[in-house]
């Protein structure tokens, strides 16, 4: 059972899956036609009538929630307009000021939602993907956009590590999805798919020594 489907980003892939056929395939095609004519925050729930109340009014559903969603772009280089968009997302989400040189001489990869309200930034300086930023602006939270961004990133990278301030409210989510984490001063270092101890030690050392790129007023 798939708990969430993002039509904009998942539809083409799902339609090519061998296990999706007959009635379910037709149902997904019909849902896409419906959602294409509705606002991007619209959704359709596939569930049994018995579980409909829980599906509609709680976060823990029993069926599949199909959302119109937003397309997620992946970029190695950004133009000026895209840099402005990413800066706005980061500064709005983190409530701080992005370092002026953040986009200079970068070895980064950028995921940006088509609605310009969420972004993930991957650094390749370490060899293994380092998630330098994961940001969703406040008015987009609760729509499943962050989850769609996260799943897109993980579909591209089976090994990834990142750091988060120890007081970050998203750390409970990180603890649920990571394979392990380690606290270091004001940071928590998380990782997925990294089992070699020598490689992991190098990743933790890299993460703890990265300079801050979001600055806050005193």
Regions found by a protein language model. Give the residues of each.
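C-terminal catalytic "cap/lid" subdomain
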Residues: 1-160, 168-172, 179, 188-218
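Short beta-strand/turn micro-motifs composed of small residues
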Residues: 164
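Conserved acetyl-CoA-binding loop of GNAT-fold acetyltransferases
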Residues: 177-183
């Amino acid at each position: 059972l798939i708990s969430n489907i993002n039509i904009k980003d998942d539809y083409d892939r799902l339609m090519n899956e061998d296990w999706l056929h007959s009635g379910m395939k037709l149902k997904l095609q019909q849902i896409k036609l419906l959602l294409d004519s509705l606002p991007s925050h619209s959704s359709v729930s596939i569930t049994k009538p018995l579980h409909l109340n829980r599906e509609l009014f709680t976060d823990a559903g029993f069926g599949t929630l199909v959302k119109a969603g937003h397309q997620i772009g992946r970029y190695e280089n950004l133009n000026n307009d895209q840099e402005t968009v990413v800066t706005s997302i980061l500064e709005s989400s983190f409530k701080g000021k992005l370092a002026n040189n953040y986009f200079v001489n970068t070895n980064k990869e950028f995921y940006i939602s088509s609605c310009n309200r969420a972004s993930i930034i991957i650094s390749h300086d370490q060899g293994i993907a380092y998630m330098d930023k994961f940001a969703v602006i406040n008015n987009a939270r609760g729509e499943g956009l962050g989850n769609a961004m996260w799943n897109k990133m993980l579909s591209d990278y089976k090994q990834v590590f990142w750091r988060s301030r120890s007081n970050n409210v998203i750390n409970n989510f990180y603890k649920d999805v990571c394979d392990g984490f380690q606290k270091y001063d004001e940071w928590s270092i998380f990782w997925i798919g990294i089992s070699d101890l020598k490689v992991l030690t190098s990743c933790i050392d890299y993460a703890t020594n990265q300079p801050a790129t979001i600055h806050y007023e005193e």
